[in-house]
Amino acid sequence: MAPTMRKSHPLLKIINGSFIDLPTPANISAWWNFGWLLGVCVIVQIATGLFLAMHYTADTSLAFSSIAHICRDVNNGWLLRNLHANGASFFFICIYFHIGRGLYYGSYLYKETWNIGVILLFLVMATAFVGYVLPWGQMSFWGATVITNLLSAAPYIGPDLVQWIWGGFSVDNATLTRFFTFHFILPFIIAAMSMIHLLFLHQTGSSNPTGLNSNLDKVSFHPYFSFKDLLGFIILLGALAILSTFAPNLLGDPDNFTPANPLVTPPHIKPEWYFLFAYAILRSIPNKLGGVLALLLSIMVLFLMPIIHTSKLRSLMFRPAAKAFFWALIANTIILTWIGGQPVEDPFISIGQIASGLYFLIFVLIIPTLGLLENKLLKI
């Protein structure tokens, strides 16, 4: 009997091995759906972004007007713009759930997959940052000025580095043009890196909620999980459609409806909501270089996870003490997100400093120590 085409064709058998006959642990929950949803987000963002790029003009005198033109004059341009802007928010919601699941169930022990994932997070954050500058509103301009200025904290090369990125002595036309270039190319790099992420994942297979070896109990990805994933897909696209049509500006900043003006500083410069936790950590340290390092370390701490895993158990499912501190970390990150959106005054400064300290403490000290303690208590 001749093998089916999907198993014999050189290209189709790669797709078959990744999405159809892929052996998948039978007990994975809905938390394993987010990786697939991130793929959907990348496709939605690239599709809407391509059509927006056809009508956008990367010039300081025309950028703001070109966004207004897209929303008013282009067929369904308002929808494309809203889907793209809010799609970024859903992208980050999925990313944070995906990382949270990885931390909870010990997925970081697949080191290559995890490290590629953290690099992907940096790439997505860079893409979102340069994309936020493109409408050339007040918050776009001042956000770009403040964040790029942080590079001046680098010893010796800092000031030159900032001018090199700006393409001049301030954020101007050269900056906007290069940011548009980066915003256009980075999603394709993200798509390529996602393939590598999957390649490494399929070397080991998926983890599962118990953290045990699941080779004894696997089912094919299709039809079981392909249909199960459709539920998340419908919820994601449904929520994105509702937000983009009924409350498209809910997550945006009102200041961005004002064209960029280098002579007027907005009262509170803040990034989009998905960067607020890192922004709060940056602001909680009075020293500029210290703040920049803390900002970088708030994400780079994820690289340490496979190294500082001390427990003999993989998943937090059977680790009640560590589980409690995992949820404390989640609550702490939500507090940091809230603080990042508040003005720099007491009590927000001190709350931010305590929350920032706890963030690093839970990651690098409390959870690893609890791992050793639990090993002793369980005599393993």
From Swiss-Prot:
Biological process per Gene Ontology, one example term: mitochondrial electron transport, ubiquinol to cytochrome c
Keyword Transmembrane helix set for record: yes
Cofactor names: heme b
Binding-site positions, heme b b562: H84, H183
GO CC annotations, alphabetized: mitochondrial inner membrane; respiratory chain complex III
Main location: mitochondrion
Keywords from the UniProt entry: Electron transport, Heme, Iron, Membrane, Metal-binding, Mitochondrion, Mitochondrion inner membrane, Respiratory chain, Transmembrane, Transmembrane helix, Transport, Ubiquinone
Binding site for a ubiquinone: H202
Membrane topology category: Multi-pass membrane protein
UniProt-annotated binding residues for heme b b566: H98, H197
Keyword Transport: yes
Localization of this protein: Mitochondrion inner membrane
Cofactor binding note of this UniProt entry: Binds 2 heme b groups non-covalently.
A single GO molecular function term of this UniProt record: ubiquinol-cytochrome-c reductase activity
Listed transmembrane segments: 34-54, 78-99, 114-134, 179-199, 227-247, 289-309, 321-341, 348-368
InterPro entries referenced in this protein's UniProt entry, alphabetically: Cyt_b/b6_C (IPR005798), Cyt_b/b6_C_sf (IPR036150), Cyt_b/b6_N (IPR005797), Cytb/b6-like_sf (IPR027387), Cytochrome_b (IPR030689), Cytochrome_b_C_euk/bac (IPR048260), Cytochrome_b_N_euk/bac (IPR048259), Di-haem_cyt_TM (IPR016174)
Note, other: Heme 1 (or BL or b562) is low-potential and absorbs at about 562 nm, and heme 2 (or BH or b566) is high-potential and absorbs at about 566 nm.
Record-stated family: Belongs to the cytochrome b family.
Function: Component of the ubiquinol-cytochrome c reductase complex (complex III or cytochrome b-c1 complex) that is part of the mitochondrial respiratory chain. The b-c1 complex mediates electron transfer from ubiquinol to cytochrome c. Contributes to the generation of a proton gradient across the mitochondrial membrane that is then used for ATP synthesis.
Oligomeric form and interacting partners: The cytochrome bc1 complex contains 3 respiratory subunits (MT-CYB, CYC1 and UQCRFS1), 2 core proteins (UQCRC1 and UQCRC2) and probably 6 low-molecular weight proteins.
Protein name per Swiss-Prot or TrEMBL: Cytochrome b
Organism annotation: Rana dybowskii (Dybovsky's frog)
Source taxonomy: Eukaryota, Metazoa, Chordata, Craniata, Vertebrata
Gene that encodes the chain: mt-cyb
